Design a protein with these regions (language model features):
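Short alpha-helix boundary/capping motifs
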Residues: 43, 64, 126-127, 137, ...
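N-terminal leader/signal peptides at the extreme start of proteins
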Residues: 1-2
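Short amphipathic alpha-helical segments at helix boundaries and their inter-helical linkers
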Residues: 116-133
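Flexible, solvent-exposed loop/hinge segments and secondary-structure transition points
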Residues: 5-9, 13, 17-21, 25-26, ...
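Short, low-complexity, Pro/Ser/Thr/Gly-rich segments in the mature regions of secreted, periplasmic
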Residues: 135-150
Length: 150
């Protein structure tokens, strides 16, 4: 009888610990972190939504599926397939295709890539370009070429 009570007590203890852990790890902690993110990093916490002409057109954090030859394309070889950034080398390698498709001078496209280049943290990584921002810069700079995308 004593052993049975002891086993029941341990079972209740185990269930209580599991429920407490579930409550803390599954509800309290995520709500706390989400609340702190909304307070200190509201733009990032909401996905860095990009607005164009008053409409949401994408996120700076997730690659968009640009397939037309008149736009820069994101990396298709990233592990997740949603990497929003490309290297400078990748951006420069796409310039001839865009120049052929749009007639925009190569120098202007090079300048556009340079203006939209982001640095890195100290010595880590290499400079990169956000594809969505770069394509929106093209649409803004050349409204006659990209008039169906405004």
């Amino acid at each position: 009888m004593q052993t049975n009570k002891k086993q029941n007590w341990r079972f209740r203890q185990a269930i209580s610990l599991a429920l407490f852990s579930l409550l803390i790890c599954g509800i309290v902690f995520p709500l706390l972190i989400t609340g702190l993110a909304q307070i200190f990093f509201p733009n990032q916490a909401n996905g860095e939504i990009v607005q164009f002409n008053g409409q949401a057109v994408g996120s700076n954090l997730i690659a968009q599926n640009f397939t037309l030859t008149i736009f820069f394309h994101p990396r298709n070889d990233s592990a997740s397939g949603v990497d929003p950034d490309i290297t400078l080398q990748d951006a420069y390698s796409q310039i001839p295709r865009i120049q052929d498709a749009t007639g925009i001078p190569t120098d202007a496209l090079n300048q556009m890539v340079n203006q939209n280049t982001e640095g890195t943290y100290w010595v880590f990584g290499s400079p990169y370009v956000n594809v969505l921002r770069l394509n929106l810069a093209l649409v803004r700079a050349y409204p006659l070429i990209y008039n169906g995308f405004q």
